[in-house]
């Protein structure tokens, strides 16, 4: 197989599930702008890079994706059929510039009525979270044009009061603060690009559930170029990989939680 020439390269911490699924989100959006886009993970010594080949001739496709997201006001709206879901924190939404529906949190792994990956509640609704995070992302982009570079896209932070909790680098432990910042609307330094793009990536690319370990999941950084249609197979390891990673969903209370740091899954 001939590896295509990438025109997007993102530094990614493979131990960070939020960054991993944000990469999946980038591939999802690139594929909608430039059908046939392919992506893969690679390692350069201790660093991992997510490559995307869009084959579109654009001089900066990553900036084009970020512009599409940040220029939309609002970025998300409630889906047309949202009234069928009575709970505000479960209502499906649409990413307006891409007409992409997000409702993965309604799809459980087992017999429940919501996904085990849903880690928000109450006022932290998908619509409110994504629009609030996008406001923060716009502020970051305003400060300098180089804030859209792949070397730092997932690491730039801004204080926000609405987030999902996909990025463990921004997560608060209840034992440290004594209360839930999400419930109290306390601003938390958050990487908006990671949170938004992970929410998008999880619509199609979901981690595998680890049996007999409650709220533990696994993902695989795939090493071969894949289009978005087959990326879900890459996530669960049906392709050449750079290894397998397992991570917990850490619940601070019965409603709020976050993705924990991943580690190499030795039993894979």
Pin down the residues of each PLM region.
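Early compact domain cores of eukaryotic multidomain regulators
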Residues: 1-140, 144
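Elongated scaffolding segments in large macromolecular assemblies
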Residues: 2, 6, 10-20, 24, ...
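Intrinsic disorder/low-complexity segments enriched in polar/charged and small flexible residues
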Residues: 36, 42, 106-107, 122, ...
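Extended amphipathic alpha-helical scaffold segments
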Residues: 120-125, 132-151, 170-210
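Extended amphipathic alpha-helical repeat scaffolds
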Residues: 153-159
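Active-site-adjacent bridging/hinge elements
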Residues: 159-173
């Amino acid at each position: 197989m001939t590896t295509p020439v990438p025109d997007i390269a993102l530094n990614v911490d493979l131990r960070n599930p939020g960054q991993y699924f944000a990469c999946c989100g980038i591939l999802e959006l690139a594929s909608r702008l430039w059908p046939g886009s392919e992506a893969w993970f690679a390692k350069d010594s201790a660093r991992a890079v997510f490559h995307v080949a869009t084959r579109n001739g654009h001089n900066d496709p990553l900036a084009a994706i970020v512009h599409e997201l940040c220029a939309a006001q609002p970025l998300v709206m409630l889906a047309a059929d949202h009234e069928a879901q009575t709970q505000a924190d479960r209502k499906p939404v649409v990413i307006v510039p891409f007409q992409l529906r997000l409702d993965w949190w309604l799809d459980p792994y087992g017999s429940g009525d919501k996904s085990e990956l849903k880690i928000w509640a109450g006022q932290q609704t998908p619509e409110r979270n994504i629009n609030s995070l996008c406001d923060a992302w716009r502020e970051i982009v305003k400060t300098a044009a180089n804030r859209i570079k792949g070397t730092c896209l997932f690491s730039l932070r801004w204080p926000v009061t609405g987030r999902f909790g996909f990025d463990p680098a921004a997560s608060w432990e209840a034992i440290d603060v004594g209360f839930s910042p999400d419930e109290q609307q306390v601003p938390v330094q958050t990487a908006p690009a990671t949170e938004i793009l992970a929410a998008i990536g999880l619509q199609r690319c979901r981690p595998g559930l680890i049996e007999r370990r409650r709220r533990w999941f696994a993902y695989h950084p795939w090493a071969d170029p894949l289009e978005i249609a087959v990326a879900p197979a890459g996530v669960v390891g049906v392709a050449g990989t750079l290894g397998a990673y397992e991570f917990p969903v850490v619940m601070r209370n019965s409603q709020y939680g976050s993705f924990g740091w991943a580690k190499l899954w030795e039993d894979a």
